[in-house]
Amino acid sequence: MVLQNESDKDINLGHRCYMEKTNKTALLLINTGSPDAATVEAVRRYLAEFLGDRRIVELPRWKWWPILHGIILRTRPKKSAERYKSVWTDEGAPLIVHTKRTASALEAELGIPVYWSMRYGSPSTASVLDAMRADGIDRVLVMPMFAQYASQTTAACLDGISEYQLSHVDVPAVRTIHDYHDDPAYIDALATHVRAYWDKHGAPVSMGGRLVMSFHGIPKASSDRGDVYEAQCRRTAELLAQRLGLERDQWCLCFQSRFGRDEWLRPYTVDSVRELGAAGVTRVDVVCPGFAADCLETIEEINDELRREYLSAFRGGGQSEFHYIDALNESPEAVKAYATIVRREAAGWL
């Protein structure tokens, strides 16, 4: 009989734990998030978390906290809740619905587990990482659902991963997808998606119209400090225009969803579309290449509010048309593109 001392037992236990590693790989999709419900209280909770992130509002806390808690969270939730109600579906918030469907389609395409989380709201990244650990996942490829990198989006999502790693002892191996703004698979998906819409509704350029590529804006100060977002948006727009065979005067790039009083990236989408209407451009098609899934900012802000702005500003003769081309969502072309990117980024794991 061979006796083992305590150190031998510890070594064997450690060896056994190591051998039990499954090398099981999974994909984690992360998007910004939505309130849990289109109610004032749910929106207030969501805005408190979202606007409380230093990535989103970079003001010193002593200056921002009184504004956020003393003014914004008292006045904005009611109006925002009404806006969310206008886009809410039987399944919930559009962003959540489309992200969930995209994850399911990718899981079928890739043959690996695909999880999804939200940086703000539910399901939180921490809760999903807990579920992944419980499922035996020990290698995670993180894909923030933003083709163009920005501190306020991609980096904020990756902060959620870092926070989890800091608070846990045993964490999975992690790889992250930084951006895919000029990836041929992504550009092909966008072009296929736009052409499919034009096959059904005609192309604006055949009517003397314009394709407007609207990206979410960020503060100009962020870009001035070196954020690559603006340059990546412009590159995406140029590549998409080339793939669609558009001349430079047949499309334009602009930025939407400005928040607060600071200057954001220009030109602003609402100004650009008003100018097109005032100039008598009879058809305007808007596509939002930076939005992986339709949400409040595309459905309500673009398809509803921006439509009204264009029609109100239109000064030409005859009929005017405004078309919103929906986000990639869970379309076959989107799933194919994401799968191509994931297989490359997960090389050696899959």
Which stretches of residues belong to each language-model region?
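Accessible peptide chain termini
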Residues: 1-2, 19
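Active-site-proximal alpha-helix that buttresses catalytic centers in soluble enzyme cores
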Residues: 18-350
